[in-house]
């Protein structure tokens, strides 16, 4: 699964370096076997953003992208759109959304996002948002895709703050930014992904990869 993620990330020509950040010797061994650059990080990190921050302490860059190893359907196009978003003035944190499929609308493992007219995230939730009270069919639901881009000051700030109440409740680390007034800008992509969090997710991904769609 990691190989799919690495190769998709490596295909993005705008990235200077692709580094696997891990606290797992098993993953490090896979990296050595394939000749991939990797960094061993602390096993104490509570989130992927904390792990990216540790790497950012040692490697200077304009923008840091986080692509999670459980996203085997990652595509170069995801990263291209995200990097374009980060070129806008004032964007410190960026991520992606895609129209939510009917089966994911009520799935708590598929995180939903609501955005303002200017693309800033208003909220992320495992619940169905927005809620279509009158069942009008006019409420558009968007799924959040777990790709992130950060500038260093935003990473520094995130790691200086404790976990927020909303973050603990939803188990969504990005809510820490919103709780502290840091805007997360969201770009839209037509390319959905399936993060592998459960056995059912794994079966879905295997079926998609088998058909090549």
Description of each model-found segment:
Residues 10, 28-32, 37, 178, ...:
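Class I S-adenosyl-L-methionine
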Residues 74-164:
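Conserved core of the sugar-phosphate nucleotidyltransferase
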């Amino acid at each position: 699964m990691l190989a799919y993620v690495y190769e998709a990330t490596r295909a993005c020509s705008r990235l200077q370096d692709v580094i696997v950040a891990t606290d797992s010797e098993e993953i490090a061994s896979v990296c050595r076997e394939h000749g991939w650059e990797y960094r061993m990080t602390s096993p104490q990190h509570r989130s992927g953003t904390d792990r990216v921050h540790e790497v950012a302490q040692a490697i200077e860059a304009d923008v840091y992208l986080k692509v999670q190893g459980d996203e085997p359907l990652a595509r170069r196009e995801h990263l291209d759109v995200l990097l374009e978003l980060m070129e806008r003035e004032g964007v410190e944190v960026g991520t992606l959304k895609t129209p939510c499929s009917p089966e994911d609308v009520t799935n708590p493992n598929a995180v939903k996002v609501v955005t303002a007219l200017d693309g800033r995230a208003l909220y992320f939730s495992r619940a169905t948002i927005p809620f279509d009270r009158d069942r009008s069919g006019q409420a558009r639901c968007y799924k959040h895709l777990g790709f992130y881009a950060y500038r260093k000051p935003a990473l520094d700030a995130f790691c200086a703050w404790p976990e927020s109440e909303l973050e603990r409740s939803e188990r969504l680390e990005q809510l820490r930014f919103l709780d502290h007034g840091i805007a997360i800008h969201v770009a839209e992509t037509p390319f959905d992904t399936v993060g592998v969090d459960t056995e059912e997710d794994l079966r879905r991904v295997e079926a998609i990869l088998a058909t090549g769609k």
